[in-house]
Amino acid sequence: MRAADTLQASLREVVGEANVLTDPDATAGFLVDWTGAYRGEADAVARPRTTDEVSAVVRICSGAGARICVQGGNTGLVGGSVPPARRDPERPTILLSASRMTDIDEVDVIGRCVGAQAGATVAAIDARAAQAGLAFPIDLASRESATAGGVVSTNAGGTRMIRRGNTRSQVLGIEAVLADGRGLRRWTSLIKDNVGYDLPGLLAGSEGTLAVVTRVLFRLVVPPASAVVAVAAVDHVQTAIDLIGAASSQGLTVEAAELMTEAGIALVHEHGQRRPTASRAPFYVLLEVSGPGDIEAATAELLSGTDGLADAVLEPAPARALWGARESHTESIARSSATPVVKLDISVPIRALPEAFAELAGVGDSGDFDCRPVLFGHVGDGNIHVNLLDVPVERAGDVTDTVFGIVSAHGGSISAEHGIGRAKARWTHLGRSDVDLDAMRAIKSALDPHWLLNPGVIFG
């Protein structure tokens, strides 16, 4: 009997016959990311239901020397949620899916927190919080499919980061399974708990390379009593930055700040999304603000005093139609490229944002690359999502080199919130020194000495 067959039989004893998938038709959806750019191979897909089952699955795989790839909602954009492209003939590969781990606890209203299994979606967690009059501080365009385990593993930022911080800031406690199958539980609603290392913080952003996250205790927040959403058509990136600063100076709380371009708005309009403003401009800034008193009047006054503004529209939150212009970018971009979109998630210091944005938008004009750049992102924290359409497949690495060169020249990061995954593993040296990388490898080796968890992710 093949080693993979023996392994599959052992896994079936833990999670049941129906939850160990080996038929190619059944496993196909787990082995390709949603963009279609990354495809992998696995000897089986295991779907545990509880932390104990995850522990048993990992213990079996560890004993067999099998590689374990962890997957939540499979909405990642850097290839970290699918297995390596080729099987290792010496070691089986198991994809561990959290798709059955969707439980969400009752909300602790006094402690303002809620526990959720790794497969619970962002939207479901927020809905549970809303039942208690609270809100989940993480919000993403992929909220209906992105999962608790996924946002923790990538330390996702999202549209509310300017107000609430990244995912790591929202994690109070965590349950995880180490590479040898032992369970790690750091579960407390204490705001102050300074005993030793911050292991939940370490696992946030580790992309499944240090442990398998199974449950998370998230912080919840009180939603603003009143908020409005404005989309302003502006002449320059600096105008958008100044608008955010002016909002804060006038006593408004900036809940979200998103930047779009005319190229992006035209693209989403082609795919059925209405234009947010009647007038066109090079840039569009979406601003969601809250505050006391007549928030609409205060926001209207803010906009009226902005130089370089061609047009603006204002609606009470949640203003889904206005948000739709921003949130439909990713899907519209994916449907508009003749080749897999080169998707890069970068950040630069806000002071460098106007110049860096112009250089990145000009990548397709240099003559070196025949591509269409579409840029958008979180202007309030310097995060730009660079999307390069119609790049010849053989030039994807070259154009990525160019983009990352621009980012490095401005003192930026090659990964703002999507993680490194497989897509950026060859470029990690641009963001970390040799000593830094050695320290990261030492941590990896300490927690996963045989390097079984998510092979190829972060370190290549």
Model-derived segments and their meaning:
Residues M1-G460:
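Noncatalytic alpha-helical scaffold of FAD-dependent oxidoreductases
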